[in-house]
Amino acid sequence: MADYDLTKTHIKKLAEPKHEIALSTEDLNVYYGDKRAMHDASLQFERYRITALIGASGSGKSTYLRSLNRMNDNIANTRVTGKIMYRDVDINSDEVDVYKMREHIGMVFQRPNPFAKSIYDNITFALKQHGQKDKKYLDEIVETTLKQAALWDQVKDSLNKSALALSGGQQQRLCIARAIAMKPDILLMDEPASALDPISTNTVEETLIRLKEQYTIVIVTHNMQQAARISDYTAFFHSGHALEFDETRKMFTRPKIKAAEDYVSGHFG
């Protein structure tokens, strides 16, 4: 792999965004023990847009994504410095209630991880944990979120069946429905379609495009075609650095950084 000058970056600040900034980071650093895995990442995420995080394996994109709702807190000997700004609050502060913050910034993981419960209970579990007992409200949330996740028509007559009986693609859409049941502002997605077949992947992509009408979405993907199809903005990561951030169409046609050009053209990664 070529050596790149990591001091040269092209991070396009959204000084006049079409929509407000939903989430941003300022000089974000992540350390695993003595290893620095993320270097001074400063990015902005526009509300009601999909931003793709791309880069080779080990580039830091998933580390960065997990930082956005402090999932890295669960990893031993991990330290995060810098600011993560949400609603004018630095959610990287020790004073922030992490669990309450995650109600606003939800996450969907790479592999479907439904609970060993019914389809209905998968979606209502967190709501019930927060004290919601109104059956009518819970029923409405189940129907609404399953429709948003393009799953309602397939499961509306089997809501009491185990979620584990669903196909992989259906399970992932259930996990999306479960994530939005808490009505978050932001959805973080770590390669949500990488374990799915092409038809299921297409369905998930169509679902995400619809969901951005109501949610801000940040997605890690290794699939360049997927990033080009569904995202409005793209951030390119290399060796723990966010090197380039721009509108997706510009990133894929006129990248400013040599490393980004090599990656999107398939010369490495």
Curated annotation (Swiss-Prot):
Which is a Pfam family this sequence falls into?
Answer: ABC_tran
Q: Which PROSITE patterns does this UniProt record tie to the protein? A: ABC_TRANSPORTER_1 (PS00211), ABC_TRANSPORTER_2 (PS50893), PSTB (PS51238)
Protein's cellular compartments: Cell membrane
The answer, when asked if Transmembrane is one of the entry's keywords, is no
Q: Name one GO biological process term.
A: phosphate ion transmembrane transport
Amino-acid positions noted as binding ATP in the UniProt annotation, renumbered to this chain: G55, A56, S57, G58, S59, G60, K61, S62
Q: Which residues form the ABC transporter domain?
A: 23-264
A GO molecular function assigned to this protein is: ATPase-coupled phosphate ion transmembrane transporter activity
**What EC number(s) does the entry state?**
7.3.2.1
- Has keyword Transferase? no
User: What are the UniProt keywords, alphabetically?
Assistant: ATP-binding, Cell membrane, Membrane, Nucleotide-binding, Phosphate transport, Translocase, Transport
InterPro entries, per the entry = AAA+_ATPase, ABC_transporter-like_ATP-bd, ABC_transporter-like_CS, P-loop_NTPase, PstB-like
The principal localisation class reads: membrane
Check the record and name the CDD domains matching this protein. Answer: ABC_PstB_phosphate_transporter (cd03260)
**Membrane topology, as annotated:** Peripheral membrane protein
Please give the catalytic activity noted in the UniProt record.
phosphate(out) + ATP + H2O = ADP + 2 phosphate(in) + H(+)
Entry GO terms, CC: plasma membrane
Family that this chain belongs to: Belongs to the ABC transporter superfamily. Phosphate importer (TC 3.A.1.7) family.
The record's annotation in PANTHER family points to: ABC TRANSPORTER I FAMILY MEMBER 17 (PTHR43423), PHOSPHATE IMPORT ATP-BINDING PROTEIN PSTB 2 (PTHR43423:SF10)
Assembly, in brief, is: The complex is composed of two ATP-binding proteins (PstB), two transmembrane proteins (PstC and PstA) and a solute-binding protein (PstS).
Briefly state the protein's biological role. Answer: Part of the ABC transporter complex PstSACB involved in phosphate import. Responsible for energy coupling to the transport system.
**Protein name stated in the entry:** Phosphate import ATP-binding protein PstB 1
